[in-house]
Amino acid sequence: MAEIRPFVSIRPQRGKAAEIAALPYDVYNREEATKEVERHPQSFLSIDRAETQFPLSVDMYDDKVYERAHDTLWQWVENGTFLTEDKKCYYLYELTMNGRVQTGVAACASIDDYENGIIKKHENTRAEKEVDRIRHVDVCNAQTGPIFLAYRANEGIRRIVEKTKQGEPEYDFTSEDGVRHRVFVIREDADIAAIHEAFAGVDSIYIADGHHRAASAVKVGQKRRKEHPGYTGEEEFNYFLSVLFPDDELMIMDYNRVIRDLNGYSFKGLYREVEKRFDVEEITGAEDTRPKERGTFCMYMEEHWFSCHIRQEDRTPEDPVADLDVSILQNKLLEPVLGIRDPKTDGRIDFVGGIRGMDELVRRCEQDCAVAFAMYPTSIAELFAVADAGLLMPPKSTWFEPKLRSGLFIHEI
C-alpha cells in the first residue's frame, strides 16, 4: 500500500520553465556547473549548486553556500519567477527522447514507505554525498530535485495519464540535448482521488535514480520529527518529491567500463585469459560493436573489437546480483585477471555512460586507457529482482536516460 500524495508545488512561471530547468545537481563537477550558470544565469543550478555563485576559494560546502541557495530560491518566489500552486495537485511529466516517450506522475512519496520497504533501494549511498543534500534541503526548507521512482505498470494510472495528456500542457519545451519536456497539471478532485487510490494498490515502488536525494530527504524528515515530537504524519516533511514512471516506459542504457592498464599482461596474454573464461570471436568490418543481447559484452583493445559470450555454467539465476552481466565480468575477469578488487574505489577503472556511444570507448583507449568493455544494458526486471531480494546492485550498473530536470517542481517542507 503505497502512499503517494498530491502537493502544493512551487514551480516556474510558464514562460520561464525552459531556462530554469536543469539537469540533476550531481551530473556536473564544480567547474562544469559554474560554466553552465555563466551561460544560463536563470538555470536552477544557481540554487541546486549555489557554490557557482562564489569564487573557487570558497569551499563548496561552506555554510554561506547553503544560505545563498535558500536566499535565491525564496527571492525567485518573491519576485514572481516561481509561482506557488493554489491547491495540492499531481503533475504529469512527459519526456521524449529519440521518439521514445515516458510519462511520470510528479507527487510526494512517504518517508515511512521508504523506511518500511515499500519503496525499495538497490544502491548504497555515501555519507559525504548525503550530508551535502541534507544541508541543502534543511536550509532551503524545500526539496528541489525529484527522485526518479518506478512501479509496475498499472492500467488505472495509465487511463488517467492518457486522459490528462489530451489537454493543454502547462510547459512544453525542448532542452539543449534534444529531449522534449511537457508538464500537465492534474487539478480535478476526482482525478486526484483516483490517482491516490490507484497508487494505494501498488505494493512496491523502486528507486531508479536519486538514492542520495531520497536518503537525504528521509533524514531531514527524521530530523524534523525529532524537532516536532507532536508531529501527526501530515506535515510536509514526512514526504519527499518524486516522479513515478511505469516500468514498461523506462529505458536503461548500458554502463561501460574502461581500464587504464592491462595489469602486466600483453595484448595476447590478456586475450588468452579472456578466452579461458568466455566464448570470444573478433568483430570485423562494419559490424555494430554494441552487445546485441543479455549474456554478451564487447571488448576493445589495440584497435580490435571482440564479442564475448558468457557461458551457461557461469549463470546463477538463483542469485539476482551474481547473475548480472556486470557481476560476471567483475568476478570472472576484472578482479582475478585485471586486479580491480573494488570498482568503487580503484582509480584504474572508469565508467562511461552508454549515452556517449561506442566511439567514446575507442577515444578513451586512444587517450588514457588500455581496454574497454561495452555492456548490454541491465533490464528494469533485473533491477526489480535485485531490489525485491533486498540486495544491492554492483556499482555503475544502470544508466537512465533521459534525466529528470530539476526546478520544474519544488516541494516546501
Residue map of PLM features:
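Surface-exposed, charge/polar-rich loops and edge strands
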Residues: 1-413
